[in-house]
């Protein structure tokens, strides 16, 4: 079988103007970005406002191996399967970060014959949204340090009188806005800025700082959660970047940089329209990670897709304890649109990996034993699949399990898994997906069962309400969302929680940052752990995004490169074709 990029580069694609027209978009709704992608003007929503919403299908997964279990492949393949059944359908996915593209996982366009195309354009820059977010974010960083420098150089009173601006009196030790870049670079996690030659201060105030990956920026979350340009502007203005010497929050609005940040992101608020290999329209917008952010594509993209098609297929990052949980508890209450069906992706290798019988390490190849028949490992890993089925069902949604088939899978083990799921005393259906090898033809049974599931009545129930205290919300996610015994706040986190409550932020949602390798916060614990403690070492206020960000365990907001990064495989030939991208 050809490689992903070879399949994509030899595919016959439809011009984007035709894709958009068939979708119901007018010429003035789109701004073409070459022949096969276009920006969709957010103002199209005004024209579509009176149209009914279609069905929203949310794709999630069991606890994944480091290489993933095929959520995007299934998302794209399912959309293609629905289209082959004659349904009106679109897909919504996140824009890939170049960190993972050059790091461990490679690209995020799907794979095989279920890809978004052109995949090299999707995986590398696309229309520049992530770069715009990086620029806007670092503009705020520059504004913070410039303000500290000038106020301290002149003195607060002189600065205020000279510039007719209030002195913000930012405490340099309480700047909470790190810089960002769209690469995995562990060396930038902790840096010292503002260093000067002896006797000079021209480079600013020396202080400790650090970098996060752009996908972890609050601006990325804001882009994904904003409903229109005005909402984007207001959210950016609410961002707390530091605290002053009296312990009061300092916002981007206080720095008078929020407007310029929004201007920098003006084009980024418009989703990018692309297509699958079979011509299914696909909206690509925003790219928050699910382990260190809320892990879902944008509300704006969903809203446009739901107005234009009867079915919209989207995905939440990592397992159902991650992106799916955040879609239900953060995204859905804001969008006022809950999923109509949950599709849970499982693989034989992923179930075996959750048996706890094999060592797994990020950046390392999967053990060969995962690809061979192994009844003991398969049986031992079923607890994880059952946990994720129950987890999706607890939100009041019908669940369809999609068994993503790999070439080495045996029919005997597939049949065993099908029978096991079919015999569960739960509202769940199951089908094998061969989206990777067969495209839409490999998901026809899955598509039929998803249509059936979408016809069921749902009783969508998030884990918490806005009226609950922040502590109770954190506990709700840990206990009801993960099956933990309790949370355990560090002394620092306790102080931060008290501060946020005192400042009036108790109505915000909570966003847990933790390892995706386990339902718990310890990536070494596989299966369906119980009675564990969720340690929260630090809390961060994301007032613009509308949530409190809880750092659990040892999760990092700036990834590092593995021993053998994916960028080693990338090159370009004499004709300008990219090779080695997966």
UniProtKB/Swiss-Prot annotation:
The UniProt record lists the EC number as 6.3.4.3
Which residues are noted in the entry as ATP-binding? 65-72
Reactions catalysed according to its record: (6S)-5,6,7,8-tetrahydrofolate + formate + ATP = (6R)-10-formyltetrahydrofolate + ADP + phosphate
An annotated Gene Ontology molecular function: ATP binding
Q: Which GO terms describe its biological process?
A: tetrahydrofolate interconversion
Q: Where on the tree of life does the source sit, at the highest rank? A: Bacteria
Q: Which UniProt keywords apply?
A: ATP-binding, Ligase, Nucleotide-binding, One-carbon metabolism
Protein's recorded name = Formate--tetrahydrofolate ligase
């Amino acid at each position: 079988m050809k490689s992903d990029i070879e399949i994509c580069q030899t595919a016959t694609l439809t011009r984007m103007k035709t894709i958009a027209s068939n979708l119901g978009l007018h010429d003035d709704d789109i701004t073409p970005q070459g022949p096969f992608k276009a920006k969709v003007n957010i103002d199209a929503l005004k024209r579509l406002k009176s149209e009914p919403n279609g069905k929203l299908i949310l794709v999630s997964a069991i606890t994944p191996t480091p290489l993933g279990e095929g959520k995007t492949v299934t998302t794209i393949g399912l959309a293609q399967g629905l289209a082959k059944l004659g349904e009106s359908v679109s897909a919504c996915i996140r824009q890939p970060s170049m960190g993972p593209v050059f790091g461990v996982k490679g690209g995020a366009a799907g794979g095989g014959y279920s890809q978004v195309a052109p995949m090299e354009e999707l995986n590398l820059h696309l229309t520049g949204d992530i770069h715009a977010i990086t620029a806007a974010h670092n503009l705020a960083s520059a504004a913070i340090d410039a303000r500290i420098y000038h106020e301290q150089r002149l003195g607060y009173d002189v600065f205020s009188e000279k510039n007719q601006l209030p002195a913000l009196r930012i405490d340099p030790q309480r700047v909470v806005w790190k810089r960002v870049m769209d690469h995995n670079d562990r060396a930038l996690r902790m840096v010292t800025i503002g260093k000067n030659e002896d006797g000079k201060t021209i480079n600013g105030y020396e202080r400790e700082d650090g970098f996060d990956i752009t996908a972890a920026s609050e601006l990325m979350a804001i882009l994904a959660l904003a409903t229109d340009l005005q909402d984007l502007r207001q959210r950016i203005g609410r961002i707390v970047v530091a605290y002053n010497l009296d312990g009061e929050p300092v916002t981007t609005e206080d720095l008078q940089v929020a407007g310029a940040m929004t201007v920098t992101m003006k084009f980024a608020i418009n989703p990018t329209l692309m297509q699958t290999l079979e011509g299914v329209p696909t909206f690509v917008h925003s790219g928050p990670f699910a382990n260190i952010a809320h892990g879902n594509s944008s509300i704006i993209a969903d809203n446009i897709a739901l107005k234009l098609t009867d079915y919209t297929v989207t995905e939440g990052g990592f397992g159902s304890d991650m992106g799916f949980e955040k879609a239900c508890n953060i995204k859905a209450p804001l969008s006022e649109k809950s999923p109509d069906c949950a599709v849970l992706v499982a693989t034989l290798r992923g179930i075996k990996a959750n048996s706890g019988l094999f060592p797994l390490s990020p950046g390392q190849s999967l053990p060969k034993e995962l690809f061979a028949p192994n009844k003991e490992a398969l049986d031992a890993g079923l607890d994880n699949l059952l946990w994720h089925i129950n987890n999706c069902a607890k939100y009041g949604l019908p669940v369809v399990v999609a068994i993503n088939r790999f070439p080495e899978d045996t029919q005997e083990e597939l049949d065993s898994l099908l029978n096991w799921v079919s015999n569960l005393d739960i509202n769940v259906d199951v089908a094998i997906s061969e989206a990777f090898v067969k495209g839409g033809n490999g998901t026809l049974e899955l598509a039929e069962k998803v249509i059936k599931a979408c016809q069921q009545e749902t009783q969508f129930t998030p884990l918490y309400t806005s009226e609950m205290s922040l502590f109770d919300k954190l506990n709700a996610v840990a206990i009801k969302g993960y099956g933990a015994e309790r949370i355990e706040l560090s002394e620092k986190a306790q102080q931060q929680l008290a501060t946020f409550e005192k400042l009036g932020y108790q109505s915000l949602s909570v966003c847990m940052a933790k390892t995706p390798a386990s339902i718990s916060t310890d990536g070494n614990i596989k299966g369906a752990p119980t009675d564990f403690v969720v340690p929260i070492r630090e809390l961060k206020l994301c007032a613009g995004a509308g949530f409190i960000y809880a750092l659990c365990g040892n999760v990092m907001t700036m990834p590092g490169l593995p021993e053998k990064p994916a960028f080693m495989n990338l090159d370009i030939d004499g004709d300008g074709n990219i090779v080695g991208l997966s």
